[in-house]
């Protein structure tokens, strides 16, 4: 979009050069150049002075607030020009070798205990009981509070407020500090679109894990369908592969459907599993109309509209909490040892300020480490998002990965952050000195969904000179669309095994596929190509659902038959 905008701006300038009125006096180029230079120097000087004095921030944890505070020109320019990690002054083969040598001296063998590991990232999840300026008619998160108080837990420092989920995601998955990147940058939209990176997935693969991502929102949001391949995931189950039937009043999928997705994924493999589940129910905005009836009442706010937003949000966290309780209950019953790490990705966009929080920090959410087996691996403590992976893996003696290893053993060193920046630069923008000058991470062949759709059979039903096509297979849902000879058909979802295309005259030799595509029509995956032939028959013992037209026709025929019978009876009498 930035490139398109720049091209459009240049095109307009060129057009104006030729079409705009010409001045009738001599232009004083020297004076104008001096003025431009002075404006540039004064402007940059003022910005640098503001940054040095702390009046202007180079980092945008809250993009919306930053644009309001510092203005569009500064924020937009900074976001466009300041991307990636600036090359550290001391970056060299020898400096990286020194860091790597330090970490290798700390490497240990992995323990025999390799539990399933689940990271549950809860969208905008926050315990409203931690606010000092409001009162609630009921506790919206009793399950979370109980687990939080009984298991290792603490505050999680995240890089964003109110939005920017993928930046918390990025730090947790890679172990890299977002402060080292450009202002407001989303690495999911920049470097990770075409570059692999060390991640918790690649690190756990060293111990035999299969790695899965689950998200009850569209796969293309933040480009996850591309990025997750570069982060080492084997499967990615998005809303386009799920059968979600309930949504919030603002249109987000409810989180309770994640439970079965998580359990099914654990059942899928014989290996140990790592699952990164990303919820969406708590997503903003929280504006609802006056007809919304809240279950939890909020008092203490002067603004009626804001109060309604808080009440709506409280209701959503209440439902998310029920999902947490049901998931924990289900995991307790499983024989496989499992660690479940739960946390909010950032505070909700409700205008929350530090002074109204018990912990006085808008960049902190809460996390808890639950497990279904006895262990003493973890203690209550605060942790930064980019150190969470190492906090979970260190007690398990899983030291694979340059960044993971370095954080495990050097996070308290005085030069830790600088060396971490060096390692991240080396891996994403440098010469890969840490890994023998080669990128060791190969992008995975990411499978969309754990149960891909499959087309097995086609049947045509003739009805009143109209031919309806029935397409049979497995794992269909409302995002499944029939394509015939590369042309999308208007598709009706009947059930998980059946799709229907009305008025569809398929000819012998036609090529048919079923595609899973998002709401914008982006094709995410498709079945193997199916060539229609005379041998195709309907599945045994299967009666296709009646269409409304068929039912109406039957009713009409039945009515006519009944009328004829009555006429016959009258005549006989």
Q: Which residues make up each language-model segment?
A:
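N-terminal secretory/membrane-targeting segments
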Residues: 1-115, 136-155, 190-194, 198, ...
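Solvent-exposed soluble domains appended to multi-pass membrane proteins
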Residues: 101-112, 122, 127-573
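Long, solvent-exposed extracytoplasmic domains/loops
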Residues: 117-121
